[in-house]
Amino acid sequence: MHRRNFISGTIATAIAATGNLAKAHSSRELPDYNLPEEMLPRTVRIREDLAPFELHVFPDEFGLYWTMPGNVARRYVVGVGRPGLYVPGEFYIGAKKEWPSWTPTPGMLRREPNVYAKWAGGMAGGINNPLGARALYLFRPGRGDTFLRVHGTNNPKTLGRRVSNGCARLVNDQMIDLYNRVPMETRVVLHPPSV
């Protein structure tokens, strides 16, 4: 399915989302990211009658959609995997973690040992952890953990870009908002890029 079949328009009603959103959900102080209006979560109409309560990532538009009843979805602006590292397909949420620890994958260590070797033993959860405040772990039936995540970041400059090792990322306050909506076993679709 292509983006044009999913979204009926780009004009949408903004959802109240501020830098203070996460403070109600976390005892840790998060920065105010001061994102422009177009980077805030919005409720948008979707064209097709997709099942509610699914996650869909469209990499060409850097959009992550949490589908809801009534052919609407909550849209978040995300950063996605770099060319060659974005993996389209169907997944499910196999784990959810608050302030998760992080260890670089074997692939990350092979590709960029100078960047990741110092963290080969892992990093405790916290504001400077690459997975941010929350993470949704993507699993496949029969395979288990894919090492792909939908996770937080404290670097808003990475949103709307192809920057990651395959994961989708949101700023921490928006990730907390999404995390609180998405239950275990939720179906996740990473749609293929158009090129």
What is each model feature region?
Residues 32-148:
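Gly/Pro-biased beta-strand-loop elements
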Residues 158-166:
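Short, basic/aromatic beta-hairpin or loop at an interaction surface
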Residues 4-24:
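N-terminal export signals
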Residues 96, 151-153, 193:
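Generic beta-structure capping elements
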Residues 168-195:
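N-terminal targeting pre-sequences for secretion and organelle import
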Residues 24-30:
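Cleaved targeting-peptide boundary
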